[in-house]
């Protein structure tokens, strides 16, 4: 027996809308560009969009078109094609501090205690909000170009490792790794007190 759907068809549009509804998108930057032609200037728009599911997946895209909505649509589609998965500690922050760099844009991302919130500027804030991160401290150095900052933030997020992946790479158990970390912490604190 064939399943009946309201509206007929095979339901591809409905499936696509359900898949799209799980993503949150944020417009980071829109830029008006001009091409000089024989008859004058021809204007176009470039859009930078960040898309995420607020559960650890995020992507960014760049789109160009003659009209703003079309540029945003293209950027959103590109962002959905380039999603990356980021492991979050307790579903709210990073496992460890990471640095990222793209061009002259540099970012430092630090794990933060619960209740800190997102302490980040401009383009980085959009990435963290769509990622679903709740507590993070971020600092951007060098270039303030939104394209470079978003790319540098993604480079930093790609460098982040969960304890599970580190333990698998070293061939040890996660509990062993975490016990070593707890054993090392008091020594670091006593050395800091002496200095």
From Swiss-Prot:
Q: List the disulfide bonds.
A: none
Region listing for Disordered, in residue ranges: 1-20, 161-195
Q: Does the keyword Transmembrane helix apply?
A: no
Q: Coiled-coil stretches, from where to where?
A: none
A single GO CC term for this protein reads: small ribosomal subunit
**UniProt keyword Lyase, yes or no:** no
Query: What family is this protein classified in?
Result: Belongs to the universal ribosomal protein uS5 family.
Physiological role: With S4 and S12 plays an important role in translational accuracy. Located at the back of the 30S subunit body where it stabilizes the conformation of the head with respect to the body.
Q: Which domain of life is it from?
A: Bacteria
Q: Its Gene Ontology molecular function terms?
A: rRNA binding; structural constituent of ribosome
**S5 DRBM domain mapped to chain residues:** 23-86
Query: How does the record comment on the protein's domains?
Result: The N-terminal domain interacts with the head of the 30S subunit; the C-terminal domain interacts with the body and contacts protein S4. The interaction surface between S4 and S5 is involved in control of translational fidelity.
Annotated protein name in UniProt: Small ribosomal subunit protein uS5
Quaternary structure annotation from Swiss-Prot or TrEMBL:
Part of the 30S ribosomal subunit. Contacts proteins S4 and S8.
Q: Which UniProt keywords apply?
A: Ribonucleoprotein, Ribosomal protein, RNA-binding, rRNA-binding
> Pfam families, from UniProt?
Ribosomal_S5, Ribosomal_S5_C
Which species expresses this protein natively?
Answer: Methylobacterium radiotolerans (strain ATCC 27329 / DSM 1819 / JCM 2831 / NBRC 15690 / NCIMB 10815 / 0-1)
**Upper lineage:** Bacteria, Pseudomonadati, Pseudomonadota, Alphaproteobacteria, Hyphomicrobiales
């Amino acid at each position: 027996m064939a399943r009946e759907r309201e509206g007929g068809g095979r339901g591809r549009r409905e499936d696509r809308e359900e898949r799209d509804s799980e993503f949150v998108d944020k417009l980071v930057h829109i830029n008006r560009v001009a091409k000089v032609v024989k008859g004058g200037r021809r204007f176009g728009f470039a859009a930078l969009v960040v898309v995420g599911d607020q559960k650890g997946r995020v992507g960014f895209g760049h789109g160009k078109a003659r009209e703003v909505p079309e540029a945003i649509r293209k950027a959103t589609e590109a962002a959905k094609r380039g999603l990356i998965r980021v492991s979050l500690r307790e579903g709210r922050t990073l496992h460890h501090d990471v640095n990222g760099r793209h061009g002259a844009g540099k970012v430092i991302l630090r794990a933060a205690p619960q209740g800190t919130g997102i302490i980040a500027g401009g383009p980085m804030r959009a990435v963290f909000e769509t990622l679903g991160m709740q507590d993070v401290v971020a600092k951007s150095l060098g270039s303030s170009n939104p394209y470079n900052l978003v790319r540098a933030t993604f480079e930093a997020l790609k460098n982040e490792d969960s304890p599970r992946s580190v333990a698998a790479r070293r061939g040890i158990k996660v509990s062993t790794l975490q016990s070593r970390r707890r054993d090392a912490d008091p020594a670091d604190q006593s050395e800091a007190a002496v200095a």
